[in-house]
């Protein structure tokens, strides 16, 4: 079962997110997600197996330029995670579908995402669910 997350879901959402982004703390994620959930142009979806939360997806609208698109806003998959024992069963595809449906209700005609160059599993997922590679970039930073 997939459902849109609410404020009451922050603790479980943050725990799942820390599996995807292990450099973050649950408390930090709760705070960040509370701010994001309050915005009308962002949404989280949770996947359940019976009563157990097994995955989540974070999506939002991007109004700035999104590589490979020519419309605005663009729905954007910011993150997606499914617990190990539930992968390869279509859960991530269902989460993505919920995000895409949400983006359509917000007036989007395009949906985008990204992944790190060395994340082969994520790249394969994106290709398997219909994304097309738009570009590869290298990001730079510089201390001032």
Question: Which role fits each region the language model picked out?
Answer:
Residues 14-28, 65:
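Helix-loop element at the rim of GNAT/NAT acetyltransferase active sites that forms part
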Residues 70-84, 138-139:
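Conserved acetyl-CoA binding element of GNAT-fold acetyltransferases
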Residues 46, 52-61, 76, 81:
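Conserved beta-strand in the GNAT
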């Amino acid at each position: 079962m997939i459902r849109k997350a609410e404020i009451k879901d922050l603790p479980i959402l943050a725990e799942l997110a820390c599996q995807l982004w292990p450099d973050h703390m649950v408390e930090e994620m709760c705070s960040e997600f509370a701010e994001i959930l309050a915005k009308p142009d962002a949404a989280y979806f949770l996947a359940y197996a019976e009563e157990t939360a097994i995955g989540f997806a974070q999506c939002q609208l991007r109004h700035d330029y999104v590589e490979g698109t020519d419309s605005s806003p663009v729905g954007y998959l910011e993150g997606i995670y499914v617990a190990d024992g539930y992968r390869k069963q279509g859960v991530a595809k269902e989460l993505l579908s919920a995000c895409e449906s949400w983006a359509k209700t917000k007036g989007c005609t395009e949906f985008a995402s990204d992944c790190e160059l060395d994340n082969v599993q994520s790249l394969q997922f994106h290709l398997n669910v219909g994304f097309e590679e738009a570009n590869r970039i290298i990001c730079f930073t510089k201390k001032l």
